[in-house]
Amino acid sequence: MKKAIGLLLAGLFLSALLGGCASSPGEEKKEEAGDEPQVYPLPVNVMGRYEESEQDMLPRFRYSLAEVHEVDGRQGIAWYDGMYYVSGSTTLSVYDAGWNCVKVNSSPFDGMETTANHIGDIDVWDGEIYAGVEYFMDGAARDLQIAVYDAETLQVKRTFPVSEESGQTEVSGITVDPDSSSVWMCCWEDGESGRYLYRYSLGDGSYLGKYHLQAPPQWIQGIVYYDGWIYITSDDGTADLGEADHIYRCRVDLESTSFSVMLERTLDDVTLQGEIEGISVDRGAGRMLISYNRGSRIVLGMVRGLYEGYEGEIHEVFVYDMYPGN
């Protein structure tokens, strides 16, 4: 009897062992099909912690206000080959080295197939002006595109539509990054679209992806690429309360999906707090250029009246000497 029970138990054990090693029909089918279980979230891909690096967290430059120049455009500023280029909402202008206006295009949308009424911050590269163009009204934009102008004639040469796949809903600024053959764009809107920088091919204008800003500045107005970094102007100060706007920066790392954002400069030395706009770097003189407006009240990105004592909005470019280190 004991021998029979022992044989029975041994048989049950062997059956369980073999059953545990065998795959079920469903599992065999899944393995044969080559399906792999997807694991979310993905492993952390950020190398290093910016908050623990004094070199990364502190400003890259010290700034000293050198000059202030009144210009005719309220949106953007760019330096190229000794000349200064200024964008208004509906104009493009060129200034010589002495800040004298030498040429204006008052009809920059002529020849475009889509409706446009707004140019943001601009950049100039290889004899061409790059501009983000759109139709903008009361905080909402449509018909976003990249417009490329001849820097000599100020006439449009070609345009590229902004990718719907990108999710970008407004374009406030643009900059050329020759090191990676890229064109970068930013969004002013204070929502999901404003939390990214958008990358396009400098060659054919094709969309190359977007990069998450962590943490994103509020109301981004302009960007400029300089020496591996993108500098960002943010209209995050409330002018009615005398709060200053700011410049931020992030390192370009195409292997990452996100860019960590650091504070670079508080603009507490402008004539009067108002609305920061475009940004550029005079690479010849080692100076940062900041476009700034004062005198008008801004609601949803639109001029809605003037402050007391002003008969019109004043557009100025603040020129800062840049000194490496802290």
Predicted regions and their residues:
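A short helix->beta-strand "capping" segment at the edge of beta-propeller domains
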Residues: 44-71, 261-263
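Beta-strand-rich domains and repeat architectures in extracellular enzymes and scaffolds
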Residues: 63-90, 118
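Repeated scaffold domains used in trafficking and secretory/extracellular systems
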Residues: 71-78, 113-123, 165-176, 216-224, ...
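Short coil/turn segments that connect the beta-strands within blades of beta-propeller domains
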Residues: 81-82, 126-127, 179-181, 227-228, ...
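Loop/turn-rich, solvent-exposed surfaces of beta-rich toroidal or solenoidal domains
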Residues: 215-256
